[in-house]
Amino acid sequence: RDRVSFGMQSAVPAVLRTLDRRHDPAKLPGLVIAARQLGLDVSVDLIYGAPGESLQDWEVSLREAIAMEPNHISAYALVIEEGTKMGMQVARGELPMPDPDDEASKYEIADRLLGEAGYAWYEISNFARRESGEEGCPSTQLRHASRHNLAYWRDWDWWGFGPGAHSHVGRYRWWNVTVSY
């Protein structure tokens, strides 16, 4: 089945502002319902470790994502890249670097909550919802494990649609702009 991934990142508006994301997290449940009505599998992407994000903020985001019952959840640790807006804010001392101990705690919270909700960890940042009969199945063979992730590691082609989406076809990689005009 085809899958759509929603870049939720966080359910906490203050964290989204720190990440320079402009969407309203309250609209996502309706979009998830619409995607399911179209027959699509749903994945939700989260980012943890934003400056100022508390353990409670992260838990709220995880619980909001789990409540939508997506087939797949990615939980990525924030990486602050040199030359980006956030990288420059950190370099100027306006934002702190993520605390590795805090990030480790957030990963452990994700592993616990997602496991309790029936998601199986299969790749460093990825969790797929187990279906009936998949209890003993190797995690990389789960129905909801991401084919895109497999395609990425095997250098297969994929197309990304929407703001900031990445694509790879042949030897070419590109991404869409995130700013609307």
Feature-to-residue mapping (PLM):
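C-terminal scaffold of the Radical SAM
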Residues: 1-181
